[in-house]
A protein has these predicted regions:
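Long, structured stretches of catalytic cores involved in phosphate-ester chemistry, encompassing
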Residues: 1-130
């Protein structure tokens, strides 16, 4: 992976099936394998350009931030969660248990990251400049 990340890019989107930044819930996450999580975060932090982590498989959505790393988790569009609230020190805003999806809109020098419900209402958003 390190060799791949040495290639030139304007903006990096890293996709993972489980959350990287979330630490406080009891479900599967990179924090359950702390050495690998630390290695991945350190590797991403070394990159000079902006990056975004996208993840899913939580049956809820949210946006997380650690230093200059941002992660959007979205899922699911057809089967939300019955758990109504969840917190995390790295969470921006709150998590959403209703059906949702993530949308990335790339512009000349920025990416708009949105978490949207099934009725197309924006639940959370953040803009990342690069």
């Amino acid at each position: 992976m390190e060799q791949t990340l040495e290639q030139d890019f304007d903006f990096l989107v890293l996709a993972t099936s489980i959350q990287v930044l979330a630490t406080e819930h009891r479900f599967e996450k990179w924090n359950n394998i702390p050495k690998d999580r630390t290695r991945l975060i350190n590797l991403l932090n070394k990159l000079p350009k902006q990056k975004l982590i996208i993840s899913g498989d939580r049956h809820r959505g949210g946006i997380y931030k650690l230093d200059n790393l941002i992660e959007i988790t979205s899922s699911s569009l057809n089967r939300g969660s019955s758990y109504q609230s969840e917190t995390d020190a790295l969470l921006i805003g709150k998590t959403y248990s209703q059906n949702n999806y993530g949308l990335l809109t790339f512009n000349q020098n920025s990416v708009l990251v949105e978490l949207i419900d099934q009725d197309n209402n924006i639940l959370e958003s953040i803009s990342i400049s690069f």
